[in-house]
Design a protein with these regions (language model features):
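Proline/glycine-rich low-complexity loops and linkers
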Residues: 161-176
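Non-catalytic surface loops within mature trypsin-like serine protease
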Residues: 9-11, 150, 200-202
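Catalytic-core regions of hydrolytic enzymes
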Residues: 20-160, 168
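Short glycine-/small-residue-rich flexible loop motifs, especially phosphate/cofactor-binding loops
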Residues: 82, 117, 163, 183, ...
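Surface-exposed edge beta-strands and adjoining flexible/disordered loops or tails in beta-rich
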Residues: 1-25
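Envelope-exposed proteins and targeting segments
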Residues: 1-3, 45-49, 88-90, 125, ...
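A generic structural signal for short coil/turn motifs at secondary-structure boundaries
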Residues: 9, 45, 61, 205-206
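Active-site-adjacent mobile loop/cap segments within catalytic or ligand-binding domains
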Residues: 130, 135-137, 174-211
């Protein structure tokens, strides 16, 4: 895989972020335990990638010191990433393209997260990339991290490839590494999946870089 996330153009972990609301483990949601078929060979041309801009609609996500909301940072970053991947020949889907709840307003955590994963699974995606911004009660904490859940054999590989390209983007406090996370969207996606934490919105400098 080679997936480039250029956050500068858009603009351990204290908090494995709560994606939507904290769901209980679900049953009956499409996309359990790596049953899908996906391609890891070759370049990006012809690959199917689903991008998930975190939060949206009734869920603002984390909020920075100036009031900047996570949902308003993840969407333009995701749109930029979509364009960059398409320019390299990938077919890209997004779980949302506007400021909306994916399942519907004020959905339960399981419904909202399940709706996002189901989009990736329905398109038989080769990779799922969820974009988020971290937050912590210490405003000096910062940096970029990538989470994975080892279910397909390629999740950690994808996380490492992406993290190595984005870890030292100017304006952010460096490399927080890859970390395994028992997160719903990573567990329930059929394909290799990562969740990228592009800095800390609680850090004034990083909030500024995200705008």
């Amino acid at each position: 895989y080679r997936i480039v996330v250029d956050v500068q153009k858009k603009g351990m972990a204290p908090k494995p972020v709560n994606y939507g609301k904290k769901p209980s483990p679900a049953t009956g949601i499409a996309g359990s335990k790596g049953s899908g078929k996906y391609s890891t060979s070759g370049g990006l041309a012809g690959k199917v990638i689903t991008i998930d801009p975190g939060h949206g609609g009734s869920d603002p996500g984390a909020i920075g010191p100036t009031g900047y909301q996570e949902k308003n940072a993840t969407l333009p970053i995701s749109k930029y990433l979509k364009s960059a991947l398409e320019a390299r020949g990938a077919k890209v889907y997004m779980t949302r393209t506007t400021d909306v709840d994916v399942y519907g307003p004020n959905a339960s955590g399981v419904d909202e997260l399940g709706a996002r994963v189901n989009i990736a699974n329905a398109h038989n995606s080769d990779a799922f990339v969820s974009i988020h911004i971290n937050s912590f009660n210490n405003p000096t904490v910062g940096g970029i991290a990538t989470y994975y859940y080892a279910k397909t054999g390629n999740d950690a590989r994808l996380a490492q490839k992406v993290q190595s390209q984005i870890a030292n983007v100017p304006g952010f406090n460096g490399d927080r590494g890859i970390q395994e996370g028992n997160l719903y969207v990573l567990r329930h996606s059929n394909m290799p999946a990562i969740l990228v934490e592009l800095g800390f919105i609680s850090n004034p400098n990083e909030e500024r870089a995200l705008k």
